[in-house]
Structures are given as C-alpha cells and as structure tokens.
Amino acid sequence: MHNHEDKQLGGVGFDLGAGSGSEMSAESLALPVDELSHGAASQEAPVERHSVEDISDVRDFMLVAASSSERGARLGNEDCAWYGDDCACLSDGIGGAPFGDVMSRLCCGAFDKAWKSALDAVGDAAGRWALGEWCMYQAFVSVDAFVSKASSCLGEGSGATLVAVAACEGELVFGRMGDSTAYVLCDDGGLEHVFGNDRGRIRAGGNALRAAMGYHVLRNGGNAPLQTASMPMREGMKILLCSDGVWDQLPAARIAELLSLDGEPCTASRSIVLEAAEAGGERSDNATAVVIDVRRSEMPSGQQTPWISTW
C-alpha cells in the first residue's frame, strides 16, 4: 500500500508530489456539486508518484459490495452508506450537532457526482491511474463546498465524517475526513488500517473530531485535513468502510475474524454491525459497515458491471 498523505481543505495548497513543482489551491477546486465542470482539466497534472502492479487485467476484476447499519442505543441513525458504479462511501453525522442525519446523506449523495466529475476532468490521459489520489482530493473538496452551504443553513456545528473508496485503473483509491475509516483484510488474515494509527480525533480516547465535512470550527485554525491513500487492486481483497460505532467497539482482530469467516459481503457487514451494537450495550453508537470483495470476473470485459451491489 502506498503511504497515506494529509492534505488541507479550506484554501491551503495541495502539494501534488515531491519535485513536481506544482501546487493547486483548494479554492480553485472548491466547486459546488451542482456546478461541477471540467475546468480543472486545464490545470497542470501532477507527476507520476508511484507505480501500480499489473494493471493490464483491470477489466477482469469485479467488486461486490454490501452495507449494513444498526441504530444501537441512539434514538436515530445518523450514519449513511452508499455505493455506485465504481465508488463507495460512508458518512456519520456529528453527534450532538443539528441535522447530523441530513449532513451524512448529503455527503454520500454528493460524492458519486463529485468523483465522476473529477475523473472526467482528467480524461483518458495516459497514466490516469496515477492521478487517483488527486481526483479523490478534488471530489472531497467539491463535496465539502456543497455540504458547507447546507451547514450554514442548518445550524452552526452541523457536519459529518466521510470515508470513500474508488476503483481507478487497477488501483483502489481512498479518502477520509473525520473518524470514519477504512480497513483492508491482508493475505495473512491480519487487518490493515488504511490510514495508519490515526483515529481522526483530537485526543486519543476522546470523542472530539479533528475535522469533518462542512464543519470548519476546528481546533487547527479552520483547515480541515484530508487523508488519501491508494493501493493496487488484487483478487481476494476485502475492504471495510466503517463508522466509529464499529471500530470503537470491536478490536481489529475480531473485525478481521468476522471478515474472514463470512464469505459474502452482505453477511459479513451484518455480522460486524450487530456485534458492534451488542458490544456497546446501553451506550452503543450507530454502527455502519460497507464490505467490498475484489473478485475475478469470468464475464467478457465489455459486458462487465464494475460493482455488483447487494443488500
């Protein structure tokens, strides 16, 4: 896996790669979702920063996704999960803030269009896979601009986390803001946290978020850190996107075991959220999981559906 990097939303420049000499302002990318255009195609493209392992057979892959959610002990469920043709995301409304359920749904609803617009801006240029993290950054900035407008109407402090994964020319590209996160089940049965040991919170053991979509009253001066990561797509991979109601209650070893034991994404996602809600008892949070399997497809490449969504 390629090392994750932190970028900054909120007008701070995005370094496109060591030695590239290129920098793109977040302000130049912060387009409302309803007004996304292909204008970014005229910007200088980032240099290639890494190599992918065998992308020649990318069309032979099929991704099967499923999601489950449990309300837990909360009165309502402010989590939301979504997946589409080539991407999936999960969002969790900020606890205690107004309209958390609305904000999480806005984030998920906006991400698909934002991701596709970012890819369209790149076009079919050679080496498009190397621009995956750049496209993910663009998508997050666009979603943040959109939900920030909603947040200003819904009430001060409203916002949501967002974690996403997308397939891009043989790679899986991840993005994250807040404490929702992503894991990959390793070949040896261990669980790898895509974003390292960072929990997305200000203090270890605390609940306060370091950043959230649409929420810029932050401890770090108003700059919302976005994390991205990427890795080659491989047959047999299992990816988990989850809210803090999952990882805060279940140890990594148990999550890995549940992903390994339950063969289908639908049963694995259901087992994970049910056990997380039970582990939390009377104080359990909303728990949501999206499980994605990377499989080898036997269909001709021209007839494949990149993602098969199951519930």
Describe these PLM feature segments:
Residues M1-W311:
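PP2C/PPM-type serine/threonine phosphatase catalytic domain
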